[in-house]
């Protein structure tokens, strides 16, 4: 029993029914906000499950086409492709990524033909999947990543991906000057309409672990000389501003859940859309907890994605994109 006139403010009034909660919801989660990362492997004739990411697979070309159409039909906003070449096709400079007949470029052409303007087709513009050393760039004589040689290679990758039908290229290697160089290279090659998704703040994270299996990466060492330190928020803001100055069309924060402060900061300063990537480790943690019946998988997924949206992400990359689209329909 309450004292007359107290409490005057009762926020619970706006939580009283599902209809009321929907009406006053401040954050929405819709399939159109989501991008589905997909892996396509060369030299396989059936799906290859990724053990550390239950439910995620390396696709064949044919299975990729079917899964992509299904995701788009479900309402997923975009698709982001990663190519996985055969081990014997990897080399020091990632030639398979530039080759028009390389698995990623062939798969881009497949999906561009199948889907046309029904989706936004994105490509990972990086070398780690294609190099025999597993780094995101070209190495110099001392085994260090050569920034400028790598950027030149990224331009070749981006042009090859644009030629193959990518609407958006995503340089994810965190090289200095990569966005400006790609913009110049794409424009010079006649692809002024191809957008650049800049991985503006990509942190050196332990949560990328399962992804290395997903792309069959052979990395030795780490990527701390080019990916950002997890504790450096002001450095992230500097990187964001540099990429915006160089012409980024969309900026990416990666990973998402551990860096929601950076997502919020980016959303506060960016005149272009902000994306955030719910990475493989985030996915694997929820899967593992759900498999042990410690959490409700669907509820946890929707809560995590809503949190990323609440922080300010316009676009969320998630391996649950197709599932969520079905759940929300």
UniProtKB/Swiss-Prot annotation:
One of its GO terms (cellular component) is cytosol. The active site is at 202 (schiff-base intermediate with substrate), 254 (schiff-base intermediate with substrate). GO terms for biological process: protoporphyrinogen IX biosynthetic process. Pathway: Porphyrin-containing compound metabolism; protoporphyrin-IX biosynthesis; coproporphyrinogen-III from 5-aminolevulinate: step 1/4. The keyword Transferase does not apply. Keywords: Heme biosynthesis, Lyase, Magnesium, Metal-binding, Porphyrin biosynthesis. Its EC number is 4.2.1.24. GO terms for molecular function: porphobilinogen synthase activity; zinc ion binding. 5-aminolevulinate 1 binds at residues 212, 223. SMART domains: ALAD. PANTHER family: DELTA-AMINOLEVULINIC ACID DEHYDRATASE. Homooctamer. This is Delta-aminolevulinic acid dehydratase.
